């Protein structure tokens, strides 16, 4: 299955990366998928399309994000929410009349799967601990990139791996900011888990 960009911004924009990611998800064919760091919802839409092909309506997607730029994420490394393509700025500002990073815009973008999707607005440090991880099959971590945030997100999702699920972490080789790699390496070592670094160092795939 090909990864589509849907005229929006996505962190998986590099050639072949999105396709590689979807192929990894397809291998596990999860029924309940959690994404931390939804951004414009492009990966969410691709995952929902894939899971619908596999399971029809028998799947759930949970997406967590702050859905706005504020004091809670100003210290984090997040993709720019501004488009370099002026046509995209015109499209969202004057035609859609939406901020593509807002909860409302992402919900509208995913409305095809509204019965399968649960979008949660909030900080992962407070929200993840409230989610029943025993139900989750697959986690895609692409939220905050600080050491403390990645450490928290991984620890909150540990039960997923212990229940034979998968945690896929983005930006493992985030060269100029090693916090992501350091937090992942420590988490894997402390919990004696298996971790494969794949897609030329882009992803860390953590399993039991």
Residue ranges of each PLM-predicted region?
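S-adenosylmethionine/decaboxylated-SAM
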Residues: 2-11, 15-208
């Amino acid at each position: 299955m090909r990864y589509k960009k849907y005229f929006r911004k996505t962190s998986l924009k590099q050639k072949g990366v999105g396709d590689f990611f979807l192929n990894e998800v397809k291998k596990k064919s999860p029924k309940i998928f959690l994404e931390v760091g939804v951004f414009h919802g492009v990966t969410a839409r691709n995952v929902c399309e894939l899971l619908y092909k596999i399971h029809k309506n028998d799947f759930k997607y949970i997406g967590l994000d702050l859905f706005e730029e504020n004091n809670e994420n100003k210290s984090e490394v997040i993709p720019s929410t501004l488009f370099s393509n002026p046509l995209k700025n015109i499209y969202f500002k004057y035609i859609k009349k939406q901020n593509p990073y807002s909860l409302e815009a992402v919900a509208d973008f995913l409305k095809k799967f509204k019965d399968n999707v649960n979008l949660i607005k909030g900080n992962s440090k407070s929200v993840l601990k409230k989610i029943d991880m025993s139900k989750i099959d697959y986690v895609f971590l692409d939220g905050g990139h600080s050491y403390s945030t990645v450490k928290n997100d991984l620890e909150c999702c540990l039960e997923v791996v212990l229940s034979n699920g998968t945690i896929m972490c983005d930006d493992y080789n985030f060269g100029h900011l090693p916090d992501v790699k350091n937090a992942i390496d420590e988490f894997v070592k402390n919990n004696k888990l298996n971790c494969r670094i794949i897609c030329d160092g882009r992803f860390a795939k953590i399993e039991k």
